[in-house]
Amino acid sequence: DQLRLIERGYEERILRCGGCGVEARFRGDERVGFGQGRMQPWTKDDLVPLTEVGEEVDKEQAQVLVINDTRVYVPVAESVLVIPPESRVRKGTVVDRLYRNSGDRSRIDGARTPLARKSIVRTLATEYRCVADDIETALADLARGYPLYGENLTPGQLRESEFKAFLEELPDQREDEDLVTRNRSNKWRELGSTVNLNAEEQKIVSGVRHLVRVDRLKAVKVFKGFTRLGGEEIVPPGIAGELDWLPAIELYGEGIFLALDEDRLKVWEKAPGVVSRLNQLLPRFAQSGRDTPNPVTTRFMLLHTLSHLLMRQIESEGGYPAASLIERVYCANGPEPMAGILIHVAVPDIAGSLGGLAELSEPQRFLRILIRALEHSRWCSLDPVCSEHEGQGPGLLNRAACHACALVPEPACEFGNTLLDRGFVKDDAANGLPSFFGMT
């Protein structure tokens, strides 16, 4: 109770014992050695010579952090989108209402006798304005796994399903569905014949295979727990480990989805200069101990950096603050490759947002945004320092990417503003880096 932390700005902190008056001073970014070769109370043993203790612990360096420092605890969350068939479930049906109302289900499960259960079912039938048999039928559907009926997918498979859902044109969509999309790919490809484009702009148009307007989407974000600094084990929200559920939040919004041309991408990602630039980054990523939903490949670096450039341009064109935007990168090689980007907004209000972001996905407007984003990739106000940087940011995991050109507010990025490099987007002939959008 007598130990006090006295802060005199970030530069000086004092840890003082009120009982004996002993104090230690340290800076916020200072690293200190353990023990500094002095005998500690718990090592008073003839079997542990002082010199061995000092030699062993002096090699270790520690950084003193206050207990509420944001670097001490790292939240672990998983976010998924609601896609068909779940997104197409009609709202207001008996089974849908029971599915969304865990309290009513708990009342039924908590009945101690069959007679009490029957009474609760009749009461719910009156509240739902249906008959008791409808409640029983809905409960049977829920027991079979409604609405997914036992389908169990990994995070990678969920991303793949989301990617396919954006490419699929859904017939007879209703405005109350949780995923409402309008494919603009045909109109995008027709830009070359309907609008006077130069050769460079034609290449940009052909580099995007799919463009989808997302009028409505629903995201579910689940808090899985947190990790402590230096630890890998996830501490669950219920620290005692007795809970069989996780806290989650439902978010609603709109967005823009685009997918790059796969044939051109396969040629670009094999270019020697592109592969060489990635190989310079991979050892740092391995040493960082970080984990990402996607393998770090050349196509991932292109997609992730392009996503940031687009978010910054959307902030300028559409008036959306970058902190309100969220990215989702769909990236995979192999037999079912993915190369897509979703930029969306998400708010707790079930009404969603006002539609301004979805409007930017109209082909002519989005082409203007994409062209300007690519133009901004070629220069930075901190060049040549930024473009020639060998490594910057957390873990030195960024190359040509800084706050003046490619970084966005932390909530907008899936990967903590790391793994960014404008070199993968812009044309850099001097270093043998071809531009994806400059290829034919």
Q: Predicted regions span which residues?
A:
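Extended, well-ordered protein cores
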Residues: 1-440
